[in-house]
């Protein structure tokens, strides 16, 4: 059985990282139940294992944390829903296939956005979830960066709901120079975080049966 846990307050990224790592160890050693954490972070830039230092442009007083997830630099902050699925891909109802897992994450978020009338896309050689904002021009609305330890997943997905998009100017998001970033709010969708959470939980159950 899987449980969704919503953290009600802004959470420091370092605290979340320890929470994830501790829970991953429990799943590995004690066969603990799977969980999906729904988090909203205080402002932070995080760097994945493929980052380049020159992609950190002007971070000001926002902390920068170097993590073990895949990917490059991204921003987390208020108004962004960050989702951390801790799933055991070695369990009988899962598949020991990291590429398949990432495809399922992508499908999950695309379907969730579609519920709100947002047509989202995958773009070849560009990680994340994208929406068309102008003719032949796309903006990233969700970032993906995961890690797996002994087939247990952690880190995950961040979706911009009402995020302050100006903060992305402090980095080259995901190493994609001149790429645009958007949010549900910027696309004219104004919803409470709790409303979005209901949809992603419903859509999760369709993909990760």
UniProtKB/Swiss-Prot annotation:
The active site is at 174 (acyl-thioester intermediate). GO terms for molecular function: lipoyl(octanoyl) transferase activity. Its EC number is 2.3.1.181. It catalyses: octanoyl-[ACP] + L-lysyl-[protein] = N(6)-octanoyl-L-lysyl-[protein] + holo-[ACP] + H(+). It is an enzyme of class 2 (transferase). One of its GO terms (cellular component) is cytoplasm. It is found in: Cytoplasm. Pathway: Protein modification; protein lipoylation via endogenous pathway; protein N(6)-(lipoyl)lysine from octanoyl-[acyl-carrier-protein]: step 1/2. Its main location: cytoplasm. It comes from the Bacteria. The keyword Cytoplasm applies. Keywords: Acyltransferase, Cytoplasm, Transferase. Residues 30-209 form the BPL/LPL catalytic domain. InterPro entries: aa-tRNA-synth_II/BPL/LPL, BPL_LPL_catalytic, Octanoyltransferase, Octanoyltransferase_CS. Catalyzes the transfer of endogenously produced octanoic acid from octanoyl-acyl-carrier-protein onto the lipoyl domains of lipoate-dependent enzymes. Lipoyl-ACP can also act as a substrate although octanoyl-ACP is likely to be the physiological substrate. Belongs to the LipB family. This is Octanoyltransferase. The gene is lipB.
